[in-house]
């Protein structure tokens, strides 16, 4: 590649997204020194590996990545199935593969594989004469999303399965669906809300047994998370303990926070999973409302910048990949912050680039590398 082309590629990199992502990652490292200092070194290594992966992905021709979407998807499906044979159980789920000194969570990389596979389908199925998708044309991408989502769901990892579902639905919506599909989706959503209301919130006369549709099929901890969300003041020493301690931490931070390492909920270890699921609560308690706004602003830059990459992409595959990566990050941030503030049920979803975890860090950096690749090469198409 000529020097001029290389310079143009560097100029076209999504620097706003990359700088904001690095800033969030460094904030996460700083925050982790208070939440769990012993894990700081490992997370710094994960960040270094993630940056190396990001750079490596930008060097690969996007057309090669597109052609490799099918084997990448199938490889990730195979790794998910392998968990049933040699997976390690933690927190009630068979979600980790142990590779020597490392533990890998295949579901994190499956999200990337699903995005690539669905993007390839929508690219290959481009029909200018019939741009809108009806029920039949949506069956293949739905199957591509449902298969890995169900495998993750039976681990069981409900949180990741939900994130995959919302990411897939975002890609389908971006593909332009017919109004009949929108109406059908609305009806399904209303029916789902009705089922939840019937199973968890409908008043039942004394002495009458509640007839449920899905609740009796749920695991005890899953049922408890929904009942705890709907009844936040109940069972504060059991089901709602996590949520209560998190809300105390977030609320007690006030406008400017208590100061680094001065958070009582954090220092006294009242806050559960403070290095992973509830890392935002640590940040809110110690640094306050203003710093939380700064963090949300950085995530906003990542989201808007990612959508900008999709908008400017001259390649349909690249546009769908960019939207998929943006959706993957957005829904995870949305659910995690909603969870720690009590607005959404606790699902065990980590905060991208902030929470401790190698698989999460590297997979998000891989997604950001794809974004950079799409943005840098858009002038070549």
Task: Kindly give the residue locations of the regions a language model identified.
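Long extracytoplasmic/lumenal interhelical loops at the membrane interface
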Residues: 244-290, 317
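Hydrophobic alpha-helical transmembrane segments of multi-pass inner membrane proteins, especially
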Residues: 18-239, 281-341, 366, 370
